[in-house]
Amino acid sequence: MISVIIPTYNGLDMLRKSLPTWFAQTLPTEEYEIIVVDNRSVDDTRQYVESLLPEHKNLIYLYEPKPGATNARHAGARKAKSEYLVFADNDGLFNPECLAEILKVYYANKKCVAVACRIEILWDVVEPDWIAPYKNLLGQLNYGDEIRYDNHNRFYLNGGLMSVRKDVFERLGGFNPDLIGPYLIGDGDLGFVNKLHAEHALIGWAPNAQMQHMQLVAKHGSKHGIALHCYNNGIADSYALYRKQQFRMNSTMWKFLIVQMMIVLKQYVQCMFHPRDLKRHFALQQHKGNVRFFGLLMKPELRREIRQFDVYNIV
């Protein structure tokens, strides 16, 4: 059996398109469950999902009041009955063979503990030419057309569509924090990948388990959207370094902060003279995110959450 965990927050329009692709899987319905985790939505998500329960016996509605994708995914993982977990975003279209292909990768190599899946961007309208180099930043993932395995840290997982054995997920403490209230403070699913890489876990690649990630050009494919991704990545990078230092503001952290502040000042001036240089502008946003993390550390309520090594086993 395999469990699909779908966090959602006010994403009803996307969920209406995405959820039917999970009902259309080639696996028999008794061999998989779909757990929709409602993360405090104020739209009609609950009514929509509950209206489907009588027809789809493998569908489960779960409410998670603590905001953040990490918290929603963890709630779903605790609820899951299966040996294998699949984490999927609510704004994707998934091919009918998706779950069967993930299981095929596990069954072909019993040492495999996690599976990366193909993710492609599906734009609502034609995207601008300049966006091409940044598709990986938006989650596009492709390691080729053949099933492969790697334990040399060459494969990454993306929370849009990924799988992991439940026992491994629990042993490693799940995902790292991402949101605390309105604040992004951690590295979420990337932090979990780093845990797998730290022990050179065997990760499989399922090229035929596919997600088409529905994206809006006006939002995700805009210069502001890419800049926000870079800014958030900067916060996540600083969190990862802080975690590596055992959550101590030691000399390494202070040196990192000072260097990042100097880079921000330098690149800010450069951007004034090169306002159309997107690469330079996005790099500035990432370094600003690096610095912003330290401002978040000044908030006592955030600092307590940030310094938890294992947020999965804290209920």
What are these regions (language model features)?
Residues 97-131:
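Conserved donor NDP-sugar-binding/catalytic core segment of glycosyltransferases
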